[in-house]
């Protein structure tokens, strides 16, 4: 059985320019999560969110019900996560394109302060998060 490699979709999309690499022979597991300063804010997110993904331009799949139970961080805060096994094992040079959308039905605060405005940050229905990550296997 191929070794699982978890690809964190938010870092791939927002910090790594939408591209990441995994070792050849890896089975790709997608990771996604939401964190906030208290359990109630995470529960609010879970009740408001719709999360979909598409792999290699296939029809989008609704994974909204795949979030884990809410759990605490050791240093404070709470999170819920998705671990989505694609079932795909990549050989050297092969790639997988993941596209998705995370939207909410109402304004969701996450309890953090925006470093630019020094105000609380909010996730809004009119500003869904687009997920785009090309995962390529290297030798």
Residue spans for each PLM region:
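Beta-strand-rich recognition domains
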Residues: 1-55, 59-88, 97-139
